[in-house]
């Protein structure tokens, strides 16, 4: 009997007995997607909405993000909430560099995403020019529900279940590096 048929038969027997097969990478991605720990980086009025996303009504803890970390070494998600001044940009980059891999960034609000409604010389026009952003949340300020939706989209991205507007599956972020496969 060929080796492939023997292995297929053994797998079928194990599956019929209730043994579950999966890759370790998918298991790690599933665990990571359900325990995203955000770093507090509130800069303006969007930070108030970010704080209200953890209250009893919105309950962000349903998605494993209930504990906002004060130390970047314990966080894997940075939520940039509000406008980023040019003097604060190097500090934000340093905080991002101190976060362990893998790490993700959510840009929350019009100021963080595009510099805000006013073209001010002292404000960075796009947080993406300082750190790589994974999810943009529109609004001025965005409601807590929008931030929770962004966390849910980030969970899908971490698990490799994210799709673009054309229905194409986006590449899964490798569990150990920032590179895409």
Curated annotation (Swiss-Prot):
<dbReference type="GO" id="GO:0005506">
    <property type="term" value="F:iron ion binding"/>
</dbReference>
<dbReference type="InterPro" id="IPR006138">
    <property type="entry name" value="NADH_UQ_OxRdtase_20Kd_su"/>
</dbReference>
<feature type="binding site">
    <location>
        <position position="46"/>
    </location>
    <ligand>
        <name>[4Fe-4S] cluster</name>
    </ligand>
</feature>
<keyword id="KW-0411">Iron-sulfur</keyword>
<dbReference type="GO" id="GO:0045271">
    <property type="term" value="C:respiratory chain complex I"/>
</dbReference>
<keyword id="KW-0479">Metal-binding</keyword>
<keyword id="KW-0004">4Fe-4S</keyword>
<comment type="function">
    <text>NDH-1 shuttles electrons from NADH, via FMN and iron-sulfur (Fe-S) centers, to quinones in the respiratory chain. The immediate electron acceptor for the enzyme in this species is believed to be a menaquinone. Couples the redox reaction to proton translocation (for every two electrons transferred, four hydrogen ions are translocated across the cytoplasmic membrane), and thus conserves the redox energy in a proton gradient.</text>
</comment>
<feature type="binding site">
    <location>
        <position position="45"/>
    </location>
    <ligand>
        <name>[4Fe-4S] cluster</name>
    </ligand>
</feature>
<dbReference type="GO" id="GO:0051539">
    <property type="term" value="F:4 iron, 4 sulfur cluster binding"/>
</dbReference>
<keyword id="KW-0874">Quinone</keyword>
<keyword id="KW-0408">Iron</keyword>
<dbReference type="Pfam" id="PF01058">
    <property type="entry name" value="Oxidored_q6"/>
</dbReference>
<keyword id="KW-1003">Cell membrane</keyword>
<dbReference type="GO" id="GO:0050136">
    <property type="term" value="F:NADH:ubiquinone reductase (non-electrogenic) activity"/>
</dbReference>
<dbReference type="InterPro" id="IPR006137">
    <property type="entry name" value="NADH_UbQ_OxRdtase-like_20kDa"/>
</dbReference>
<comment type="subunit">
    <text>NDH-1 is composed of 15 different subunits. Subunits NuoB, C, D, E, F, and G constitute the peripheral sector of the complex.</text>
</comment>
<protein>
    <recommendedName>
        <fullName>NADH-quinone oxidoreductase subunit B</fullName>
        <ecNumber>7.1.1.-</ecNumber>
    </recommendedName>
</protein>
<dbReference type="GO" id="GO:0008137">
    <property type="term" value="F:NADH dehydrogenase (ubiquinone) activity"/>
</dbReference>
<dbReference type="GO" id="GO:0048038">
    <property type="term" value="F:quinone binding"/>
</dbReference>
<keyword id="KW-0813">Transport</keyword>
<feature type="binding site">
    <location>
        <position position="111"/>
    </location>
    <ligand>
        <name>[4Fe-4S] cluster</name>
    </ligand>
</feature>
<dbReference type="GO" id="GO:0015990">
    <property type="term" value="P:electron transport coupled proton transport"/>
</dbReference>
<comment type="similarity">
    <text>Belongs to the complex I 20 kDa subunit family.</text>
</comment>
<keyword id="KW-0472">Membrane</keyword>
<keyword id="KW-1278">Translocase</keyword>
<feature type="binding site">
    <location>
        <position position="140"/>
    </location>
    <ligand>
        <name>[4Fe-4S] cluster</name>
    </ligand>
</feature>
<dbReference type="GO" id="GO:0005886">
    <property type="term" value="C:plasma membrane"/>
</dbReference>
<keyword id="KW-0520">NAD</keyword>
<dbReference type="GO" id="GO:0009060">
    <property type="term" value="P:aerobic respiration"/>
</dbReference>
